Amino acid sequence: LQEYQRLISEEIELSRLAEDDVNLPAQLKSGERIKVMLNAGLSPEHEEKLGSRIDGIGLYRTEIPFMLQSGFPSEEEQVAQYQGMLQMFNDKPVTLRTLDVGADKQLPYMPISEENPCLGWRGIRITLDQPEIFLIQVRAMLRANAATGNLNILLPMVTSLDEVDEARRLIERAGREVEEMIGYEIPKPRIGIMLEVPSMVFMLPHLAKRVDFISVGTNDLTQYILAVDRNNTRVANIYDSLH
């Protein structure tokens, strides 16, 4: 929790420093325009304030509400949470990442103790092993998206094509369940993965046939390529994404 509070303070300070430039177009010298999207989930009030100045939400960290509660949020609680974000940016894409816990992100009501947590049970590995957690969350996302149609679903810590296939199967199942519940066809979200595991770089041609987009998770990808724990002060000096 302290780490996220620190991140909130950093984001607010960086935004204050960039206030003078925020209304300028994000444009290359060639004239090509670049879309600027927000990493969200830390400060809803701040995100709403920036709404008109950005092109959407590139990453919404759904694990934060999970971490702030004493137990798993219900499907209804999650619907309300995601609906607020999707409606706030209803004419822009919003990318919701499925529950990404483990390693340095722990749930107080689901402690995970491992000798090497960075290489252990985390991200999509947890939610595919506990499919009810995944199904409840995805149903909530799809229900929240029923009226807006601007949802992208992002899968974290993917290590194999089998994980992508299984996640897509569960998302399709959740979609059928939601349609049966509400009685009409719902918009189909775009589905993507976080590219964080080095081996998946070599699987890109196969991934491209299975997903709609790929988001590069530079923090973990750098950590795994360099074999450096970025949170370990003894070796943090050699954690360099430019290497």
Language-model features, listed with the residues they occupy:
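Conserved glycine-bearing catalytic or ligand-binding loops at nucleotide- and phosphate-handling centers
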Residues: 1-6
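Residues that form generic nucleotide/phosphate-binding pockets
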Residues: 7, 11
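Conserved alpha/beta-domain cores
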Residues: 12-243
